[in-house]
From Swiss-Prot:
Binds directly to 23S ribosomal RNA and is necessary for the in vitro assembly process of the 50S ribosomal subunit. It is not involved in the protein synthesizing functions of that subunit. This is Large ribosomal subunit protein bL20. Belongs to the bacterial ribosomal protein bL20 family. The gene is rplT. It comes from Shewanella loihica (strain ATCC BAA-1088 / PV-4). One of its GO terms (biological process) is translation. InterPro entries: Ribosomal_bL20, RIBOSOMAL_L20_CS, Ribosomal_protein_bL20_C. NCBIfam families: rplT_bact.
């Protein structure tokens, strides 16, 4: 078997890593060894945060719904329970949007929840 020299593949791999590290500060964008570590770490953060993003948005929506429902005299948990009893199925993302941009509609939803809880 002939000897395989890896210069071409090594150069391609180095170029790929340095391209991914473009825009990083200092040696992280210029030196292969440091850039490789930075790109790997960035990938780990990206993987982790794609999952955390979902949790964080749900927390934000719940906080907004809680604030708006308390302004209308009902806690978050009782509001959600009331909506379930009234068989109103609106997800938290849309509820948070309504709470921020359409307070009148949100107030009517709170009233419906209160009526369902009273029954």
């Amino acid at each position: 078997m002939p000897r395989v020299k890896r210069g071409v593949t090594a150069r391609a791999r180095h170029k790929k890593v340095l391209k991914l590290a473009k825009g990083y500060y200092g040696a992280r964008s210029r030196t292969y060894r440091v850039a490789k570590q930075a790109v790997t770490k960035a990938g780990q953060y990206a993987y982790r945060d794609r999952r955390q993003k979902k949790r964080q948005f749900r927390q934000l929506w719940i906080a907004r719904i809680n604030a708006a429902s308390r302004q209308n005299g009902l806690s978050y948990s009782r509001f959600i329970n009331g909506l379930k009893k009234a068989s109103i199925e609106i997800d938290r993302k849309i509820l948070a949007d309504i709470a921020v941009f359409d307070k009148v509609v949100f107030a009517t939803l709170v009233e419906k929840a209160k009526e369902a809880l009273a029954k």
